[in-house]
Each structure stands twice: as structure tokens, then as C-alpha cells.
Curated annotation (Swiss-Prot):
Zn-finger (PHD-type) residues: 228-277
CDD domains registered for this protein in UniProt: ING_ING3_Yng2p (cd16858), PHD_ING (cd15505)
Name listed for the protein in its UniProt record: Chromatin modification-related protein png1
Key words, A-Z: Chromatin regulator, Metal-binding, Nucleus, Transcription, Transcription regulation, Zinc, Zinc-finger
Subunit annotation: Interacts with H3K4me3 and to a lesser extent with H3K4me2. Component of a histone deacetylase complex.
Chief location bin: nucleus
Amino acid sequence: MADDTAYILSEYLQTLDNVPNETKHIFDEISVKEVAVHDIWKRIQAADSQIQSYIKSHGSLTPHPKEDALYSTIREEYQKAINIQNEKVQLADRARLGLTRHIKRLDDRLAKAGHGFTAAELLNAPDYYASSPYGGYSPSGASSARQTPAPSRSGASTAGRRRTSATTRGAIQNGVYHSPYTASLADSGSTRGQKVSNATATTQLETKADSTTPNEMVSEEDMEEDNEKYCFCQQGSYGQMVACDNANCEREWFHMECVGLKAPPEGTWYCEACRDQKLVDAK
């Protein structure tokens, strides 16, 4: 069993060779779009300054000769900025989905190995994740608030579960766009892993904002929305989530704020319903 798991992990790591470059490409695009938003903001400020300067010189009762045109320009520029920001959210979701697909693939194979499958059977089986949108993320603004993984029921074993955190938006610092977005697969302090964001993507002004590569990480069909409901609140996946260690837990995944957790729990953790049930069973 240990040899099978090690073999699966070794093969799995080889599939991650292109992930850094693919993720960096997406965040380079986000960086270029951020520069475009900055340019739009400067144009908005320039138009507004014309109006404000005229008011200071002629008073607020005398309209600027081009006031209507300037206000129209400002509204159009704001709409452009909103559209670009939405595109940035879509790109971030695409990167997140790609990383989640890789994690789910490993979870699924390890879960199968734990049920008697051999490494050869797992690695020779058709790759379900290569052709199926098994990430549950939509690039639309509706899903941007979730910014989380879509927990998989297939990874019911404790070792296969992961606690995940929301996407952290990058910031422009000294002209470099810092966009944290890589995953850490192991957390030695608990039975579940935890994804940690810590990567950067540098601005490349010559890159086209709408550029794509033949080796696109995620296809459009991978962007289908996850309609699964989790937690006591029966909402979709968003923010930080933690898995109940009861393999038969009805809900399995919970939003940390809903269960009163400020930080990921150490060791075994059960939801309130499972804790109550264990007390009943113990009587």
C-alpha cells in the first residue's frame, strides 16, 4: 500500500511540471489588465480635473462648454475599468480551477488506492479530470465571491481532505504585480492538507491583455458552476472551509466562520452534529 501510494505521488508530481508556467501566464495577463485599469484611472482624473478647474475659475453656476462630453467620457472609462476588473476575476478563477483540478486528481487516486486499487490500475485508468469540469468554478462574477475549492466527496478518507483558503488579491508594489496563488499539498501538523498562497507574477507591458496560448490550462467546459451546498448554512463553497473527520458526515465541509473557527483546527475535528451523535451513541 505504501509503495503504491509513493508511486502514485511520484507520477502525479510529474504532471505538475507545466503548472508554474501556466499559472504565471494567467497572472501576467492579470498584471497587464491592472496596468490598463491604472491608465483608465489617469484619464478619468484628467477629465475630472478639467471640470474642477473650470468651476474654480468661473463658479459652479457656469457650466463647462464641454461638460456633457467630459462626463460622458468619464462614464465610459469607468465602464471599461469595470469590464477589465471582471476579466481579472475570470482569469483568477481559471488559475484556481486549474490548481484545484490537480489536487482533486490526487485525492481521487489516493482514495481509490485506499480501497484496494493498485497503482498500475489507477495510472492506466482513463483520466476523468482531463475531460470533465470537476472543479465546480465559474469565471463569472457570481462565483468570484466564493474564491474557494469545491470539496470532493470522493476524498472521504481523512488523509485525502484539504482545508482551503480564499484567493488573496495581489498588489502593485514598485511596479511589480504580486499575485499569490500556489498550493501547498501537505500540513504535517494535521490529518488534512492546507493550501497556501505564495507566488508572484511580474508585469509584462508588451503582453496583450487578451492574449492566449495554445497550451491553455483550463477549457471553457471546465468552468461550469458548482451547485453543491455545504455547511449548516447550505451555501456554496467560499472562503476557508474545513472538513469533518466523520467519514459519514452528512455535510462533510463547513465554512470556518459558520462553525466558529478562527484558525484551522489541529488534529481530528468533528462538526457539532457529529459530536452530538457521538455523545448519543456513547450512552
